[in-house]
Swiss-Prot record:
This is Succinylglutamate desuccinylase. Keywords: Arginine metabolism, Hydrolase, Metal-binding, Zinc. Its EC number is 3.5.1.96. Its cofactor is Zn(2+). GO terms for molecular function: hydrolase activity, acting on ester bonds; succinylglutamate desuccinylase activity; zinc ion binding. The keyword Glycoprotein does not apply. The gene is astE. Pathway: Amino-acid degradation; L-arginine degradation via AST pathway; L-glutamate and succinate from L-arginine: step 5/5. CDD domains: M14_ASTE. InterPro entries: AspA/AstE_fam, AstE_AspA_cat, Aste_AspA_hybrid_dom, SuccinylGlu_desuccinylase.
Length: 334
C-alpha cells in the first residue's frame, strides 16, 4: 500500500510523509497538502467532474468516522477503490485526535464562517486552515461539489444516524440529496432555517457545495466502534467516489425535521431541566419548562411534537445549549 494511504497513522504520529505526492498503479494521484489533509485526483480520462470533501475528527474523540475515512483511503491506496471523483480527505482537530479529546480549548465546529477571526489559539488557526483547504479544493469551475462532515455524538439518540442540512437565503434543500442520504442509511434529516458557524454551514453558504453534517452514533475510543454500523454509508461513499452510485429518488422511511428554536445559554445561571443522560430526539410535552436563565428568561415548550437534540448546558455563554425541532414534510424540498 502507498505510504500516503496511511494518513491517519501519519497524523496520529504527528509526522510529515517523506513523499508528498504518490501515484497508484492505475494513475490516481494522492497528494499530501498539510497535516491531516490529503487530496485524491483520478486520471483526467476517468474524471467525472465531481468533487467530494470528506471530513472527520473535527471533534478529536469521534473515532468511528475517522476510522471510516481511513478505510476508504486504504482502499484507494491499494487500488481496490478506483476514483472517478476528486476527493479531499480532512482530519479536523488533529491535536485533539492525538489526545483522544473532543477539543483542547475551543470547539472547532463553532469556529467557521469567520468566527475563528474572533478567537485565538491553535483551534481557531486550524478552523481558518480548514476553510482555506476547502475553498481551494472547491475552486475549480463547472464541477459538482459535495461535502460530508462525519461525526458521532456525545450522548445516545432515539434516532441513531441522522444528518443536518444547512440553510442559505435563496437556496432550496434538495430532494435528490436527501434520497442519497436515505440510501446511505440516514434515518432522519434536520432541515435548518438560519445561518450557522459549523464547517458544513461554511461550505454550503460560502462555497456553494451541497453539505451535510452526518451523525453516525455514539462517540467511542479508537478500536471500540463495533457498535457503530456505517456499512450502508461506507458502500455509498465508495460508489460516489467510483462514480457507480445507483440512481434513487426514494425518501421512504426518512424522517424530516425542521428547527423550531435554538436554546442559547446567556450566563452561568443557565439551567437545563433535562436528565444528564437524555437522548437526542427525546420528545417534550407542550407546557414543559425546558430551561431558565438570567433576567427571567424561560424556554417553555409551545410546539406540537417537539423534540430536543444536542442538549448541552456546559457550553460557553453565548453558544447553543440545545435545538428544539418539530416534524416537517417533503413539501419544502426543491
Amino acid at each position: 500500500m502507498l505510504a500516503l494511504g496511511k494518513l491517519l497513522e501519519l497524523t496520529l504520529a504527528g509526522r510529515e510523509p517523506a513523499q508528498k505526492i504518490q501515484l497508484t498503479v492505475d494513475g490516481v494521484q494522492m497528494r499530501w497538502l498539510s497535516e491531516g489533509a490529503l487530496e485524491v485526483r483520478p486520471p483526467e480520462a476517468r474524471d467525472n467532474g465531481s468533487d467530494l470533501l470528506l471530513s472527520s475528527g473535527i471533534h478529536g474523540n469521534e473515532t468511528a468516522p475517522i476510522e471510516l475515512l481511513d478505510r476508504l483511503l486504504h482502499g484507494i491506496a491499494r487500488g481496490e477503490i478506483k476514483p472517478r471523483s476528486r476527493v479531499l480527505f480532512l482530519f479536523g482537530n488533529t491535536e485533539a485526535m492525538r489526545r483522544g479529546e473532543r477539543y483542547l480549548e475551543l470547539d472547532v465546529n463553532r469556529l467557521f464562517n469567520g468566527r475563528h477571526e474572533k478567537n485565538i489559539g491553535p483551534e481557531a488557526m486550524r478552523a481558518a486552515e480548514l476553510e482555506q483547504l476547502a475553498r481551494s479544493f472547491f475552486s475549480l469551475p463547472g464541477r459538482s461539489r459535495l461535502h460530508y462532515d462525519l461525526h458521532t455524538a456525545i450522548r445516545g439518540s432515539k434516532i441513531e444516524q441522522f444528518a443536518l442540512y444547512p440553510w442559505k437565503e435563496g437556496r432550496q434543500h434538495s430532494r435528490h440529496q436527501l434520497a442519497r442520504l436515505n440510501a446511505a442509511g440516514m434515518q432522519a434529516v434536520l432541515l435548518q432555517n438560519k445561518t450557522s458557524i459549523t464547517f458544513t454551514a461554511f461550505t454550503y453558504e460560502q462555497l456553494e457545495a451541497e453539505a451535510f453534517t452526518l451523525e453516525l452514533g455514539k462517540a467511542r475510543p479508537f478500536g471500540q466502534n463495533q457498535g457503530v454500523n456505517v456499512s450502508r454509508l461506507e458502500l455509498r461513499l465508495k460508489q460516489i467516489i467510483e462514480g457507480t452510485e445507483p440512481e434513487t429518488d426514494s425518501l421512504d422511511g426518512l424522517k424530516l425535521f425542521a428547527v423550531s428554536r435554538e436554546v442559547i445559554k446567556h450566563s452561568d445561571a443557565f439551567l437545563l431541566h433535562l436528565p444528564a443522560d437524555v437522548e437526542n430526539f427525546s420528545e417534550l410535552e407542550k407546557g414543559y419548562l425546558l430551561a431558565e436563565d438570567v433576567a427571567k428568561t424561560r424556554w417553555v415548550i409551545e410546539e406540537e411534537g417537539a423534540r430536543i437534540i444536542f442538549p448541552n448546558p456546559k457550553v460557553k455563554n453565548g453558544l447553543r445549549a440545545g435545538i428544539l425541532i418539530v416534524p416537517t414534510t417533503d413539501a419544502v424540498l426543491g
